[in-house]
Every structure is written in structure tokens, then in C-alpha cells.
Design a protein with these regions (language model features):
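Acetyl-CoA-dependent GNAT
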Residues: 2-74, 99-100, 144
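Conserved active-site alpha-helix within GNAT-family acetyltransferase domains
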Residues: 95, 107, 119-143
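A cytosolic small-molecule/anion-sensing beta-strand core signal
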Residues: 55, 80, 86
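Conserved hydrophobic beta-strand within the GNAT/NAT acetyltransferase core sheet
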Residues: 79-82, 113-117
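Conserved acetyl-CoA-binding loop-helix of GNAT-fold acetyltransferases
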Residues: 84, 90-103, 130
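Conserved GNAT acetyl-CoA-binding A-motif
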Residues: 98, 105-116
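A conserved beta-turn-beta hairpin within the catalytic core of GNAT-like acetyltransferases
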Residues: 68-79, 89, 136-137
Length: 145
């Protein structure tokens, strides 16, 4: 298994990531095509990366990371869309991605990795706790623009 950063767009990679995001979705619904421009923005940004875990020539997991900055926090890493293929869960791919995420955050000079996890996701919450993450008591808000 190898973990790399996305460095170029291809329709095949975009489709596989779309399949993985369906596995992540609570509803199991396909949210549609991921635009090529999104991939290009990630590839060209020094503050964002998409980590890809591959095994046997197939993408088995992804993690999308960003650096967030503020005067009170300085620099933190933020994790969005971390998923492994449901057919291979429990085989270490998520753990390998997790370690690579922590390394990525350290390389960027971040103090911590922050993320959200839905209330009904017991397996994901257990994974995070088993890997040293702690629940931080806060409310997460969203406002559509």
C-alpha cells in the first residue's frame, strides 16, 4: 500500500473518489460529479492536499486536509472527507492514512488536527479515539452561501 498526494487530475481518479464519497455519505446518495476545477484548486494550493491510499493499483481511501489559520489558533490542520473503501475496512488503510495526516499537519507547522464526526458514526468515533483523538465540546454551525 502507498499513500501519495494528488498531483494531477484524471477522470478515473475523480470517479473513484466520487464512489468513496458515496460510502461516506449517511444517505448513500451520490452527490454528483466533482468538478475538475476543484481538483485543480487542491493541487495548486500550498494549504490543501488530498491524500490517496492505493493498494493493488486501486484507490482504497482518501483524506482531504487544509490548513486553517487565525490569531488565536495560529495554524491548525482541518480534516474533511476521510473515507476508506467499506470492503477493506479493518485492514490498516485508515490507520496508515491517519499517520500520514498527522505527518502532513506537522510538516505544515500545525499544532493540531481538527475535524467533525457525526453523532451516529460510532465506528468512526471509535477509530478516532483509538488513534488518540479527543472529543472537543463545541457546536458546529453551517450557513449556506
Amino acid at each position: 500500500m502507498k499513500i501519495t498526494k494528488l498531483t494531477e487530475y484524471s477522470p478515473e481518479v475523480a470517479n473513484r473518489i466520487r464512489e468513496l464519497l458515496v460510502m461516506l455519505s449517511r444517505s448513500g446518495k451520490d452527490k454528483g460529479e466533482i468538478e475538475k476545477e476543484w481538483f485543480e484548486d487542491i493541487i495548486n494550493s500550498p494549504w490543501h492536499d488530498l491524500l490517496i491510499a492505493e493498494e493493488d493499483g486501486k484507490i482504497r481511501g482518501i483524506a482531504c486536509l487544509s490548513v486553517i489559520m487565525g490569531p488565536g489558533i495560529k495554524k491548525n490542520a482541518y480534516l474533511e472527507d476521510f473515507v476508506t473503501d467499506t470492503s477493506i475496512r479493518g485492514k490498516g488503510i485508515g490507520s496508515a492514512l491517519w499517520e500520514e495526516m498527522l505527518n502532513w499537519a506537522k510538516e505544515k507547522g500545525c499544532k493540531r488536527l481538527e475535524f467533525t464526526c457525526g453523532n451516529g458514526r460510532e465506528a468512526a468515533q471509535a477509530f478516532y479515539k483509538n488513534h488518540g483523538a479527543e472529543v472537543y465540546d463545541t457546536n458546529f454551525f453551517r450557513h449556506e452561501i
